[in-house]
Regions:
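Conserved nucleotide- and phosphate/pyrophosphate-binding catalytic cores
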Residues: 1-165
Length: 165
C-alpha cells in the first residue's frame, strides 16, 4: 500500500490463499453450479426435497438398465465422487461400467449419501434458523473482537502518521 511505502510497515498486507487443485462443482445439468442457473442442490433441504432435485434434475443418459454406463462422462458420477470416499466412488464406477445397474439405483445412493453426509450440518442449520438470537449473539461477540483489532490498527496508523492524541 502507499502508506506502507511512505511510512513503513503500517498495514499487514494479506497473502492470498489459493488452492492449486480447486475443482469446479457441477450443477445438476453438468454446467457450473449456480443459483442463477437454477442447477443447485441445497444441502440443507430435507430428504424429500433433495430426492426430488436429484431424480428430476441430475442429467443422465437414456441407456437401458442392462447397458454399461460411462462414469467419466456423467454429471451424476462427478457429484457422487465429490461427496463419497474413494472406495465408494470406485465401487459405483464398477457398478456403472458392469451394466445391470441403472441410473435410478445410482441416484438413490447419491441421495442417501447427500442426506447422511450433511446430516449434522443440516441439524445445526435448522437449529440456528429456529434460534436467531444465538446467531445475533455470535455476531455481536465477533463485532467486539473486530473492533479491538480495528482500534489497534487505527492506533498504529495514527502513530505512523504523527496524529497521536
Amino acid at each position: 500500500s502507499r502508506i506502507n511505502h511512505k511510512y513503513g510497515e503500517v498495514f499487514i498486507i494479506p497473502e492470498a490463499k489459493l488452492q492449486k487443485n480447486a475443482q469446479l462443482i457441477p450443477g445438476t445439468d453438468g454446467e457450473k453450479m449456480s443459483k442463477s442457473r437454477e442447477n443447485t442442490i441445497d444441502l440443507f433441504d430435507d430428504e424429500k426435497s433433495i430426492k426430488k432435485i436429484i431424480n428430476k434434475n441430475v442429467i443422465t443418459d437414456n441407456s437401458p438398465l442392462e447397458a454399461p454406463k460411462d462414469p467419466n462422462n456423467s454429471t451424476f458420477y462427478h457429484l457422487y465422487n465429490l461427496i463419497t470416499s474413494s472406495e465408494k466412488s470406485s465401487k459405483m464406477a464398477e457398478n456403472l461400467k458392469a451394466g445391470g445397474y441403472g441410473w435410478g439405483h445410482a441416484k438413490k445412493e447419491l441421495i442417501e449419501e447427500l442426506v447422511k453426509s450433511f446430516a449434522s450440518q443440516r441439524e445445526k442449520f435448522n437449529h440456528y434458523i429456529n434460534h436467531p438470537q444465538e446467531v445475533e449473539d455470535v455476531l455481536q461477540k465477533g463485532a467486539l473482537k473486530a473492533k479491538k483489532v480495528a482500534d489497534t490498527t487505527l492506533s498504529r496508523v495514527r502513530e505512523s502518521l504523527g496524529y497521536n492524541s
